[in-house]
């Protein structure tokens, strides 16, 4: 009888421990998702603030939205805008990878500002560099670009 009681107590302790671990994992997952969403918002805000506070970069982005193509920018301005677009594309790729890993859900793409990448200039940069991105990201992003 004593042994049975000890085994029952041991079993209940094990079940209780597993339940506790499950709750902790769920809370940790929520915390990671929250921190990741905050990081994405911070990155978007930082990029927007950088453009807003740098007169030259703001002018370049305005030209991008006006439909200019890569050949209409001098080499230095082209490099500035190229680096800005590539930084944004890597951010979008990172969001995709985090969705693939189950850290984020598709709502994360609601905040990426696709018009930036749908511009003539953005499309040129994407077409010239897409081979350097995750092979599963490329068709996903191209489909995302086509959806209005």
Where are each of the predicted segments found?
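Membrane-embedded hydrophobic alpha-helical segments
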Residues: 1-31, 35
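Amphipathic alpha-helical "stem/stalk" segments
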Residues: 27-148
